């Protein structure tokens, strides 16, 4: 049973480690979702197997509300699981994970609602479901069909837990800032103790003070830098991908500042999709040139 936000994370990590997942660390770049981590987005391509789980801090500048909204944040946490090939009983495994954190599926209204997923900037989409817990969406299930505009050879199953929403239900609180993060040497530390000031200040920056001209220039810089890295005799797809992620964040900031029109928005999305596709192709070729090393290890274990 998870009594704190910290407990919730640790229980999920322990559960998925027991299922054979490698527990890794988040990518140290501002991203809008756990899917953007290269261990999900890039390794979903090709034949190499994956069983990975991690917490990913996520930023969506337009979702900020100056700390005045009880359940809407510009910075929040996801718990991400990626399994390739996707196990046939992935839903049962997921439901068992809910039991481990203190949610009994027989005592709660848990529904799988069809909701196919798409990330336009990453050129990715998949078939999937939202998981609703007593009327509130808490998880997204996705079976990847395409990433970076490339077809996935093997379908990967992705599970994305919304940690704050799950924790609010477990702790029976209506305001995210009232969540107990952990019980330390000086008593309970709340989510608000750690993040409320950050939400207020980051919302103020995102909506009011971020320099739109600087953001436009940064977008152009990271786009050119990614193109340069991909044009090398020996391309560097991973550094290029990091440039793409930085360009995506600048794009999200431009949206928060209302600095681009609807037509311009579509042009920026197309530029990002074009870049991501080039990165995906270069990454696939680089893994192929290495002989898809994770496939070799998988065969040895078998």
From Swiss-Prot:
Summary of subunit composition and partner proteins: Tetramer of two alpha and two beta subunits.
Family matches, as PROSITE patterns: AA_TRNA_LIGASE_II_GLYAB
Cell compartments where the protein resides: Cytoplasm
E.C. number(s) listed in UniProt: 6.1.1.14
Main location class: cytoplasm
Reactions catalysed according to its record: tRNA(Gly) + glycine + ATP = glycyl-tRNA(Gly) + AMP + diphosphate
Designated gene of the protein: glyQ
GO molecular-function term, one example from the UniProt record: ATP binding
GO (cellular component) term, any one: cytosol
Matches recorded under InterPro entries: aa-tRNA-synth_II/BPL/LPL, Gly-tRNA-synth_heterodimer, Gly-tRNA_ligase_asu
Family indicated by similarity: Belongs to the class-II aminoacyl-tRNA synthetase family.
Keyword Cell wall biogenesis/degradation: no
Pfam families (UniProt xref): tRNA-synt_2e
Mitochondrion recorded as keyword: no
UniProt-listed SUPFAM superfamilies: Class II aaRS and biotin synthetases
UniProt keyword list: Aminoacyl-tRNA synthetase, ATP-binding, Cytoplasm, Ligase, Nucleotide-binding, Protein biosynthesis
CDD domains reported for this sequence: GlyRS_alpha_core (cd00733)
Origin superkingdom: Bacteria
GO BP annotations, alphabetical order: glycyl-tRNA aminoacylation
Record's protein name: Glycine--tRNA ligase alpha subunit
Top EC class for this record: ligase
């Amino acid at each position: 049973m998870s009594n704190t936000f910290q407990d919730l994370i640790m229980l999920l990590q322990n559960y998925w480690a027991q299922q054979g997942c490698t527990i890794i660390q988040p990518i140290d770049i501002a991203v809008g979702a756990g899917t953007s981590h290269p261990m999900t987005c890039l390794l979903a391509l090709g034949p190499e197997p994956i069983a990975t789980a991690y917490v990913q801090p996520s930023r969506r500048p337009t979702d900020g509300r100056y700390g005045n909204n009880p359940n809407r944040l510009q910075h929040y946490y996801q718990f991400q699981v990626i399994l390739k090939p996707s196990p046939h009983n992935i839903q049962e495994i997921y439901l068992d994970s809910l039991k481990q954190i203190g949610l009994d599926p027989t005592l709660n209204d848990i529904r799988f609602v069809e909701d196919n997923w798409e990330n336009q900037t990453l050129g990715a989409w998949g078939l999937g479901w939202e998981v609703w817990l007593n009327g509130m969406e808490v998880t997204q299930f996705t079976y990847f069909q395409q990433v970076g505009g490339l077809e996935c050879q093997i379908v990967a199953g992705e599970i994305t837990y919304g940690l704050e929403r799950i924790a609010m239900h477990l702790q029976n609180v209506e305001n995210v800032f009232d969540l107990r993060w952990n019980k330390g040497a000086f008593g309970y530390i709340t989510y608000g103790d750690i993040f409320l000031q950050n939400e207020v200040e980051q919302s103020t920056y995102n909506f009011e003070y971020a320099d739109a001209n600087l953001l436009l220039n940064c977008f152009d810089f990271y786009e050119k830098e990614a193109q340069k890295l991909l044009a090398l005799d020996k391309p560097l797809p991973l550094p290029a991908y990091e440039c793409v992620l930085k360009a995506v964040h600048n794009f999200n900031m431009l949206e928060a500042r209302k600095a681009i029109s609807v037509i311009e928005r579509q042009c920026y999305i197309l530029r990002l999709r074009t870049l991501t596709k080039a990165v995906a192709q270069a990454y696939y070729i680089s893994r192929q040139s290495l002989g898809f090393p994770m496939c070799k290890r998988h065969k040895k274990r078998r």
